[in-house]
Amino acid sequence: MGKVILSALAVVGLALGSAAALSAPTTLRVIAVQTPDVKSYRHEVETLQGEFKKEGLPVTLRVWRATYAGPDTGTIIVTVEVPDLATLAKVEDALMKPNSALGATMKRIDAIRKITSDSLYEELSP
């Protein structure tokens, strides 16, 4: 009987843990940049995405161009989507290592861009 109760409690605990994980808000970093060479910039961002994957970091990078944005039309936006702020901190730490592939790619990216805006957004759950 004790094993049945313990098993039931374990199942409830796992269910609650899964529900909590599902409801955790996603964090989105939105970076507006100026770059003279969008094609090279996109290539370096794609390289960085692959390096994050190799490192096992759950990061999704996307490059956007504003098309209906008034005076900001044409602005290049990079979004960095991570599960939470703790993961974002791990990503920043990994990027700061100068002798790593991630650090080398960031140096190349920094050389061909100027950041004009940098914001963090947290997903609102319905």
Task: Enumerate the predicted regions with their spans.
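Bacterial N-terminal signal peptides that target proteins for export
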Residues: M1-L9
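Boundary of Sec targeting at the N-terminus
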Residues: A21-P25
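N-terminal targeting signals for Sec/Tat export/insertion, comprising classic cleavable signal peptides
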Residues: R29-R65, I76
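Soluble periplasmic/extracytoplasmic beta-strand elements of cell-envelope proteins
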Residues: A32, T79-E81, S119-E122
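An amphipathic, aromatic/His-enriched active-site/gating alpha helix that lines ligand/cofactor pockets
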Residues: E46-R62, P71-D72, E81-D118
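Short, solvent-exposed mixed-charge patches
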Residues: L124-P126
